């Protein structure tokens, strides 16, 4: 194409409605979760950290400081638990594979921590179910205040969140006793919820789950996706907001890393659903 033809081509584009779509494809980019590194913590970095109690083991958590992080300031915190290892949907079950918190925050304004499930024997993280449940609970109890103290996490604005296994963990781990339950300003659970069905681990029945949920004491909970509708029968336990997530409409699956409708990547693409979730989160912080 010679120079004159190239000019005429681009002059003609608006008449055919092509320039707006071209601009959209360039600006409406999906989020990409930062890769975990071994670096020192810094704004915009997601780093691997080992608690002093677990030095010499493969147990770790990840810490992400938002791009607008400044020393001496405080930030709300998203504490995430991952789904089980389930290759069919792309879930690795690993701490470093977490995505939901990054999608909800967009990488700014929130400290984001991905907590481990400590495997039995306390030598590594568990990628399926709970490992040593009490050790998992204790890890959060010890390390969440420690991280907040060092990096400016706002103890009055801690939100637990999770996908699949992690959605169940919001209650099964996060409301396991009064001490850990007292941390949370609210929770965000996507696809599944503690008590929706009975699984193969202890106290997964609904009666046990309802005892845990009593510790929620009416606090705000964003209930996203599927396998959680029994909560509609228990409105007094929490301030529940139900948010359907039409993954199949947000993505043309398979669509890049999204290979299944059961995914923690739904908030990585702009959509009315993501906008609703983020607005819900900001509202909870405003009404501190």
Locate the predicted segments by residue:
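A domain-start/cap signature at the N-terminus of enzymes
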Residues: 19-76, 110, 201, 245-248, ...
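The feature captures the conserved acid-bearing segment of alpha/beta-hydrolase catalytic domains
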Residues: 179-273
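Active-site machinery of serine-nucleophile hydrolases
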Residues: 77, 81-142
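Catalytic active-site module of serine/aspartate enzymes centered on a nucleophile-bearing elbow/loop
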Residues: 269-288
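Gly/Ser-rich "nucleophile elbow"/oxyanion-hole loop immediately N-terminal to the catalytic nucleophile
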Residues: 69-73, 125-164, 178
């Amino acid at each position: 194409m010679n120079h004159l033809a190239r000019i005429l081509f681009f002059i003609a584009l608006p008449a055919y409605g092509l320039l707006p779509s071209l601009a959209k494809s360039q600006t409406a980019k999906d989020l990409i979760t930062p890769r975990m590194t071994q670096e020192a913590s810094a704004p915009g970095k997601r780093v691997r950290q080992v608690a002093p109690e677990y030095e010499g083991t493969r147990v770790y958590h990840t810490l992400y400081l938002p791009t607008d992080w400044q020393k001496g300031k405080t930030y709300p915190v998203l504490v995430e638990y991952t789904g089980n290892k389930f290759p069919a949907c792309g879930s690795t079950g690993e701490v470093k594979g977490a995505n939901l918190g990054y999608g909800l925050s967009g990488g700014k304004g929130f400290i984001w921590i991905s907590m481990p499930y400590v495997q039995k024997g306390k030598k590594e993280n568990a990628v399926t179910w709970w490992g040593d449940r009490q050790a998992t609970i204790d890890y959060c109890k010890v390390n969440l205040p420690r991280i907040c103290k060092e990096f400016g996490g706002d103890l009055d604005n801690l939100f637990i969140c999770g996908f699949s296994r992690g959605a169940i963990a919001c209650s099964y781990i996060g409301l396991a006793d009064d001490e850990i339950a007292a941390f949370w300003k609210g929770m965000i659970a996507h696809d599944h919820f503690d008590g929706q069905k009975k699984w193969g681990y202890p106290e997964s029945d609904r009666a046990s789950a309802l005892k845990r949920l009593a510790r929620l004491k009416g606090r705000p909970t964003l209930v996203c996706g599927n396998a959680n509708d029994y909560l509609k029968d228990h409105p007094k336990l929490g301030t529940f907001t139900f948010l359907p997530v039409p993954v199949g409409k947000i993505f043309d699956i398979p669509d890049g890393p999204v290979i299944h409708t059961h995914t923690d990547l739904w908030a990585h693409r702009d959509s009315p659903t993501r906008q609703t979730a983020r607005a819900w989160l900001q509202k909870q912080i405003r009404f501190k």
